[in-house]
UniProtKB/Swiss-Prot annotation:
Quaternary structure annotation from Swiss-Prot or TrEMBL: Component of the gamma-tubulin ring complex (gTuRC) consisting of TUBGCP2, TUBGCP3, TUBGCP4, TUBGCP5 and TUBGCP6 and gamma-tubulin TUBG1 or TUBG2. TUBGCP2, TUBGCP3, TUBGCP4, TUBGCP5 and TUBGCP6 assemble in a 5:5:2:1:1 stoichiometry; each is associated with a gamma-tubulin, thereby arranging 14 gamma-tubulins in a helical manner. Gamma-tubulin at the first position is blocked by TUBGCP3 at the last position, allowing 13 protafilaments to grow into a microtubule.
CDD domains to which the protein is assigned, alphabetical: gamma_tubulin
Gene label: TUBG1
Family the UniProt entry places it in: Belongs to the tubulin family.
Positions that bind GTP: 142-148
Name this protein carries in UniProt: Tubulin gamma-1 chain
Lineage: Eukaryota, Metazoa, Chordata, Craniata, Vertebrata
Length: 451
């Protein structure tokens, strides 16, 4: 029985990565840009109905809700070849179309005003599912709509659908170059509070690392957003292959999440993908074996989160799930796992078993692939806290000088005080502390003694 998943795309970034994601899914399932199953797509082994449903005339429609406070990106989607794919009733653009001006508070308070319209769409979509498993939210944490409206939606989804899973694909801003959004640290911190408290699982897409991978590995000089978004859609589609081409394990979202998240707050995941090549000539030379793929996944240069090396803390893996696609002999997997353990290629937590799991998944029969085997690693690693520390440092700098707070004062939430920011800062600090605690053997009893 398929457990359906509803995708919510928010703001410029969320809609752009969502668009690439659906493009990729259509290609993998042999669905044309209009939603019609192609003549050649005759294999019935994939489950399309987790992410799509069929309209009366048999064509497939994504279970997606497209939301934005300004029209530009959604209009470009509606002028693309994929315009007819989406259900037009599931597209919401705010009336005045002014956007949230890269301001979290504006996005959040607009959410309060329009929440009935938005939840009409979401509830209708949820009622149309036989057994809804949960929601996937695509957004960025630095702007206004993805962060503010995203935060508002996360809170409301918890109230309205307390038993449903909420997974997010959250894009973190690029730290290598100056941001064009001066209030980015405020936006990020306020969103992080919601991601900590209201999401079950957050897949961190770090623009810093994605840009580095595009330049170093794919040899693109100045990667454009659309090239980065292609990387993101590769990750998103690979992380859902076990749901769409079901095997024995991990064939629903809770199965994926349960194997990676042993303690509820430490639910921020990083991803790695290999082989990353756009260049066909290189691709054909390499022999990709399971061990190759699994070893490469553990190399920092393939991991899509840029974390500083912290000498004081022994950062370690809490859990790893490798999704291996392609022609794989299961005995090879066992050997590779043994090799990784023997050679101690990965450093695991001292308070629990070394949890490294492998899910085997088929590749799409309709896409020619340059590699025999490719792999996605989803890892729960304590060094992700360095990403939050960076956000906190930037936030503290601005907050100390009370810089750029006028834009926030305009909204009711911050009219009298900035308590919301200060509590968010505390919650993110607790999250960082817990990640540090998880590197020590006494983490099991952490939080039980009086501190």
């Amino acid at each position: 029985m398929p457990r359906e998943i509803i995708t919510l795309q928010l703001g410029q970034c969320g809609n752009q990565i969502g668009f690439e994601f659906w493009k990729q899914l259509c290609a993998e399932h042999g669905i044309s840009p209009e939603g019609i199953v192609e003549e050649f797509a005759t294999e019935g082994t994939d489950r399309k109905d987790v992410f799509f449903y069929q309209a009366d005339d048999e064509h497939y429609i994504p279970r997606a809700v497209l939301l934005d406070l300004e029209p530009r990106v959604i209009h470009s989607i509606l002028n693309s070849p994929y315009a007819k794919l989406y259900n037009p009733e599931n597209i919401y653009l705010s009336e005045h179309g002014g956007g949230a001006g890269n301001n979290w508070a504006s996005g959040f308070s607009q959410g309060e005003k329009i929440h009935e319209d938005i939840f009409d769409i979401i509830d209708r979509e949820a009622d149309g599912s036989d057994s809804l498993e949960g929601f996937v939210l695509c957004h960025s944490i630095a702007g206004g709509t993805g962060s503010g409206l995203g935060s508002y939606l996360l809170e409301r989804l918890n109230d309205r659908y307390p038993k449903k899973l909420v997974q997010t694909y959250s894009v973190f801003p690029n730290q290598d170059e100056m941001s064009d959004v001066v209030v980015q640290p405020y936006n990020s911190l306020l969103t992080l509070k919601r991601l900590t408290q209201n999401a079950d699982c957050v897949v961190v897409l770090d623009n810093t690392a994605l840009n580095r991978i595009a330049t170093d590995r794919l040899h693109i000089q100045n990667p454009s957003f659309s090239q980065i978004n292609q990387l993101v859609s590769t990750i998103m589609s690979a992380s859902t292959t076990t749901l769409r081409y079901p095997g024995y394990m991990n064939n629903d979202l809770i199965g994926l999440i349960a194997s990676l998240i042993p303690t509820p707050r430490l639910h921020f995941l990083m991803t790695g993908y290999t082989p990353l090549t756009t260049d066909q000539s290189v691709a054909s030379v390499r022999k990709t074996t399971v061990l190759d793929v699994m070893r490469r996944l553990l190399q920092p240069k393939n991991v899509m989160v840029s974390t500083g090396r912290d000498r004081q803390t022994n950062h370690c893996y809490i859990a790893i799930l490798n999704i291996i696609q392609g022609e794989v002999d299961p005995t090879q997997v066992h050997k590779s796992l043994q090799r990784i353990r023997e050679r101690k290629l990965a450093n695991f937590i001292p308070w629990g078993p070394a949890s490294i799991q492998v899910a085997l998944s088929r590749k799409s029969p309709y896409l020619p692939s340059a590699h025999r085997v490719s792999g996605l690693m989803m890892a729960n690693h304590t060094s992700i806290s360095s990403l939050f520390e960076r956000t906190c440092r930037q936030y503290d700098k601005l907050r100390k000088r009370e810089a750029f707070l006028e834009q926030f004062r305009k909204e009711d939430m911050f009219k009298d005080n900035f308590d919301e920011m200060d509590t968010s800062r505390e919650i993110v600090q607790q999250l960082i502390d817990e990640y540090h605690a998880a590197t020590r053997p006494d983490y099991i009893s952490w939080g039980t003694q009086e501190q």
